[in-house]
Amino acid sequence: MKAFRCRVCDAALYFENYLCTTCGTSQGFSRDERSIVPLTAEGGYVDATGARWTVCANAGIAGCTWLAAEGNQLCFSCSLTRTRPHHDDAVGMTQYVVAERAKRHVIVELDTLGFPINPRSEDNPTGLAFDLLSSVAENVIIGHDNGLITIDVAESDIAHREKVRAKLDEPYRTMLGHFRHELGHYFETVLVQGDVLERARDLFGDETKDYQAEIDRHYSEGPPDGWESSYISTYATMHPYEDFAETFAHYLHINETIDNARQFGLMNAAPATSFTTFRDVVIGLWIPLSIALNQINRGMGRERLY
């Protein structure tokens, strides 16, 4: 995530800041500028084109720090959410704040990398939308269906998430990870078409395989022997769809961590764009960085980061 500076006093700002603690200026995130900008006393902002922006209406209930275009109540990120927990569901609403924060994070990440985000509408029924649901009173299945991503906001609870992670024997499980994985499914449907489809099949396998049958096989037999040489995770071995989504998610994990390391002066190597392939980025930048970060975690008595 990009490092930000207050435009009034040049103090450091972080992605979710709504106030500069140094000079006291109210702040809001401009998706158009990919930057945190100072607000007027009334909570407004006028950009270089003369367009007017205001604080998102979800600032209170979702902790949103983004700006909405004049005439719109919601910012771009919040407008993608089709369903949220009922306001009487206190637990669900608390968890919903965490889910929305993760969604804002990944949208900026996708914008930075140039991935197209086309919202669902009457004219675009398979566009991107989110159902952020509470499992307090009903079962919620995380997944993707024709552009609609469903997230169980209970995954924001560390104890719940760790219990599920241990049960499924997963090395990594976070709210941000769920968004990245499900967005992998979405972008496969958007980007993997035409000639690219055959290339994807060469890499990930035939996506027309019976999905339920492959799920049953995976949970009854486990991953194939030697899976580590061809897959990013055991979950990726289940079906070509999951292989693509897992690979996409880990691509975002790796890219974000490298970018953060560079932003905060932890790396002095050549930029990722100077490498020919992403494999070269992994070998040249990611492996040395992940080893160092794992050692730092172990020095604090924690498990490895990656």
Please give the residue ranges for each predicted region.
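Cys/His-rich microdomains that often coordinate metals
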Residues: D10-Y14, Q27, G60-G63, A68, ...
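Pan-zinc metallopeptidase signature
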Residues: A11, A236-Y306
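Active-site recognition of the HExxH zinc-binding catalytic motif
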Residues: C20, R173-Q193, A245
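Short Cys/His-rich micro-motifs in 6-15 aa windows
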Residues: G24-R34, S77-H86
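Auxiliary, metal-adjacent structural segments of Zn-dependent hydrolase domains
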Residues: A59, A99-I158
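Short pre-active-site segment immediately N-terminal to the catalytic Zn-binding motif
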Residues: I158-F179
